[in-house]
Amino acid sequence: VVLVAHSMGGLVAAWWWAFLSEGIDVAEIITLGTPYRGAAKALNVLVNGMRIGPYVPQAVTDTVRTWDSVFDLLPHYQVVEGNADSLYPHDLPPAITKTVDGFSDKARKAYRKNRRLHKALENKVAESGRNPLTAYYSQGHATLGHASIDAQTNRLAVAKGNPRSIPQSWEGGDGTVPVFSAIPDVLEDDVPSRRRLRGKHQDLVEEQLVFKHVSEYARDRLPPAARGAQRHGVTAYLQVDLEDVVPSGLETEVKLRVVDEDGSVLDAGNVGGNVGGKRFLANRRDDGWWSAQLPALEEGVHSVMASATEVPGVGRVELQTRVGAAS
């Protein structure tokens, strides 16, 4: 059995292997942007409401708050900074989470279930002597990662970037899931089982590297002498800071930059792209990023193609993603 699972589906696949796969020959479980340690975006949605562009549709928010599966996606790491008594979501004061019925109990239950999963995966690997997990992730796109309690408003502020306790090499993510969350405990020291992609969260299922990876299972098995441990890396990445949903009818800022595998910023000759059939050209900033104004978009989902040219030693780097527009 070969499983390919995106986002939360990877948690389902990992749980199945850890607890329910006895007697089944599992060749590989490939997860794409799976929030093994949760995502701050879920915390923001539950506490501050589901946002569609600048709007917070209350009916949608009320419905989402009734789904236990969203609590499973809460950060299971120390996401809250500046308050020693409230490091995890389930520790947050009732005044912060009062709009969500039973928040603390549900968050604590989800945290314990998550820790149970990680422990079960470690035990399964130790007992079976093998680890079928391969975790694909994307890094560098601006991603919600930490939270703090605003002293003036006494509200929870969820912001982009990892908590200060996380090393800089793990900064960023796929726009939804921080890169360190896409790596389960059991793969922390298994570098060959971690592979980097280019795109944002919703685009990972369309990456050619994943397709090529899965396509290998359609081949006849090669003899051991012909097998090699080849890394599937690339040398440059185009990073994008763009909200998943933007207001329709208004121009929206997008920021882009090119980095290498170590996160060092690379120079480029031109950066720009196309969204909804309309071209845009980015201007160089002083901080390594390029900035552009996306043209006003009609309501709906639009394809975005961004590219950087004249990247030293690489040439052209491209990224394809999507953006929603809503009013």
Where are these regions (language model features)?
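Helical cap/lid subdomain of alpha/beta-hydrolase-fold lipid enzymes
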Residues: 18-232
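Beta-strand-rich structural segments
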Residues: 250-262
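Edge beta-strands of extracellular beta-sandwich domains
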Residues: 312-327
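Gly/Ala-rich beta-loop-alpha elbow adjacent to hydrolase catalytic centers
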Residues: 4-9
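Surface-exposed, short loops/turns at beta-strand junctions within beta-sandwich domains
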Residues: 295-301
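Aromatic sugar-binding surface patches on proteins
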Residues: 284-293
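Short glycine-enriched nucleophile-adjacent loop
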Residues: 10-20
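Short, solvent-exposed loop/linker segments at the N-terminal edge
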Residues: 244-250
